[in-house]
Every structure is written in C-alpha cells, then in structure tokens.
Design a protein with these regions (language model features):
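Short, highly charged C-terminal tails/helix-capping segments
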Residues: 129-141
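Beta-strand-connecting loop/turn residues
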Residues: 27-28, 50-51, 91-93
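Long, continuous compositionally biased terminal/linker segments
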Residues: 35-59
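Short amphipathic alpha-helical segments
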Residues: 3-10, 66-70, 109, 113-116, ...
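Charge-rich, low-complexity N-terminal segments
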Residues: 1-41, 87-89
C-alpha cells in the first residue's frame, strides 16, 4: 500500500517531469497550475490523506444568471466524466472534485487526471461563460 508521503513524492516527480508549476500549500497539500487555452490556467489542489488523495480544481465563479441551466449542464456532463465531477461550494462557485486511492498515483493515472482537469475545466469554460454570464459578455461588446 502506498502511503501519503510516497504518493506525494510521486506526484512531485511527475510535476517536475512535465514542467508543471506547483507549490506546497502545507505538508499534505500541493497546488498545481494546469495550463489551458480558453481558460488560461486552472489551479488544482491535491490533498493527501492516509488512504486517498483528494483533487479540487476551481473552474469558474458562481453564474450571474441562468443558474439552473448551468447546473443542469454540469450534471448532464457528470454522467460521462472520468475520475472527477463538477461540484459547487456554498457560494455557488464551480469546482472539479475527485478522490483517488493512493495506490492510483501512477504516471498513467496522473496523466489521465491532468488530462481530465484540462478537458473539463478548459474545454467547458466557453460553454459555462455563454450559459451563466451572457449579459456581462454582451455588455462588454
């Protein structure tokens, strides 16, 4: 069984190998900057527990309008997603969240996790803007 220290060390090795920027938040948590195209960056935290690592990535703040349409869109996407799911906090801000066993912290799985973060945060960004911020967008044009 992998412990939190070896899981964290494996993540750090992976991040260095892939030239991803990261910082230590505390002794159990690492924040990683995932580059994107539509959404320039997504910050993801990896919090290591005794048996699992929890991933949280901020996607976008709470929608200004059409909340129900945004949340419905997120829930419909959740059915098809790998390893992560959209969630909201008490402010209505949107995150990607996931929990993985420490034994899953392999290069192949980390590649899938980072690919999922990129696809689900960056790939969905414009759709979320169009659904939840249309008035603000039109006001800027």
């Amino acid at each position: 069984m992998t412990d939190r220290h070896s899981g964290r060390a494996h993540l750090e090795k992976f991040l260095h190998a892939h030239a991803l920027d990261f910082e230590e938040v505390n002794e159990t948590t690492i924040a990683v900057v995932v580059p994107g195209e539509k959404k320039l960056t997504t910050t993801a935290s990896f919090a290591f527990g005794d048996t699992t690592v929890t991933v949280n990535a901020f996607v976008i703040r709470h929608p200004d309008e059409n909340d129900l349409a945004v949340y419905r869109w997120l829930l419909e996407r959740n059915r098809r997603m790998y390893g992560l799911a959209y969630s909201i906090d008490h402010h209505g801000d949107i995150y990607l969240t996931g929990r993985f066993p420490l034994d899953a912290i392999t290069d192949a799985e980390l590649d899938r996790i980072f690919g999922a973060i990129s696809e689900y945060a960056d790939g969905a960004f414009n759709s979320l803007l169009e659904l939840g911020f249309v008035t603000a967008i039109l006001g800027e044009w």
